[in-house]
């Protein structure tokens, strides 16, 4: 299972992020690909969550992530805040996507 996430322009809390990610993984092992970096305030919480839940955490830039179609299987895209690049790519490839906004 892959969850692709972005935190561009996200103002929510670490608890909200971890709840959403946990819901999508639902106890499964997998890979969480972070596009565009992790906000410093979220980083320790996200890394701890990934270690405890056997989730492989990968960070990449938008330029590194042009080959989104190379991923296969169960893929969910979660956009925390707004990332138009990732939204456009999700629509192009008909991927399941969720936009999470919390001010």
Task: Report each predicted region and the residues it spans.
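Acidic/glycine-enriched connector segments
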Residues: 8-103
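Short, hydrophobic/glycine-enriched beta-strand segments
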Residues: 1-8
